[in-house]
Amino acid sequence: MKKTILLAWVGIGALCAACTSSNNTSVVKDGAGNELFVAHYQEIKDTVVINLSDLVEDYELIRFEDNDSALLGFRVMPTITEHYIGVSQRRGQPYLLFDRQGNFLCNVGNVGQGPGEYAWQIYDAAISEQKGEVYLAQFAFSPKIFAYNLQGKLTREIETGCTLSKPKIEMDDEGNLCVVQIPMPSQKSLNLAIQMDGSGNVTRTLKAEERFWMDDFNGDLFAYHNVPEFSFHITCCDTLFHYDRTENRVVPKYTLDFGMMDEKPGHIYNEIPGYYMTTVFGKGIILTDKQKCTSYYVKFINDLYGGISHPVTFKDGYVFTLREPTHWIHYIEKRLASDDCSDTDRKQLTELLESIDEEGNHLMFIGKLK
């Protein structure tokens, strides 16, 4: 029978111990010293309740500016830095730039066919505060990454040397840009990875093995930028990989073993410091502890805001929830209706509920990961 375990953590470090074997997780080592973690899906039974205060070093609730230019749509995906939040929306809408107080700064470029305009939805973005630039990569069909200043004006077009398909981009501390994309023979683009220097010159490419090839756009590439390594998951290859920039190679790091299941559930891999993570559609989130070599389902509780429970995303070294006001009202009212809501939590949540404008723009809980 599945059981739920409540851990009172001092912090993430409290779970770090010598690696021990478990019945639900294996580690496969190759001759080069790499470790591949394999979590055995059908053996994962327990659920651990984790307070968000154990994961973050600071947190805030951001109320995005409420005007027609700044309104956010459904299922938006932010790019987060210390001082900025960029938001990619559905096709036909420009990329929006905000400061960390939620103030709308500008549209970054615009939708269209002209110079510096993008015809397709922005699939990924990077923001360099050091260089004062925002980098936008379109969904597909373009061999360029557009660079804009923090006022939203085009500064340069970075040629990647091939047409990109669902690219993910990262910039290191030295200003070097790295792209990982889905290789598609139909698009005559077989590079899996492309490295560029700070001036935008291509310095290295990595041709994709056939296992990474896709014939159409029915799959996806996921990269959440939470760890120093370029950690990514292409859905046609059921493994989370690291792209090693120095060695110019990909290294398998994590996968779920579904055994003899006739139909595997849909799932997405992610990685945060100390853990691999799998979102299993219709089932929940699995964490695999790299130190303890064990896996379990996890339920996150926002003890920083009255113990409410809400979906969370881990990206760019942060944990966040970005939702419309009606969603937040639902989360709060559900918690207020629970029997175990303390007087302290009830007071905090009631004040928060009264401060929310149901017709306003999105609210974002955000915490920086330890």
What are these regions (language model features)?
Residues 24-63:
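Blade/loop signatures of beta-propeller domains
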Residues 251-271, 292-317, 329:
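Conserved blade-ending motifs and adjacent loop-strand segments that build the rim/top face
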Residues 119-122, 139-189, 206-209:
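Asp-box/WD-like beta-propeller blade repeats and closely related beta-sheet repeat scaffolds
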Residues 73-77, 119-125, 163-171, 213-222, ...:
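Repeated scaffold domains used in trafficking and secretory/extracellular systems
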Residues 42, 47, 59-93:
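Beta-strand-rich domains and repeat architectures in extracellular enzymes and scaffolds
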Residues 16-18:
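C-terminal motif of bacterial Sec signal peptides marking the signal peptidase cleavage site
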Residues 65-75, 103-131, 138:
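Blade-loop segments of beta-propeller domains
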Residues 36-37, 83-90, 132-138, 175-186, ...:
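Short beta-strand elements that form the blades of beta-propeller/WD-repeat-like
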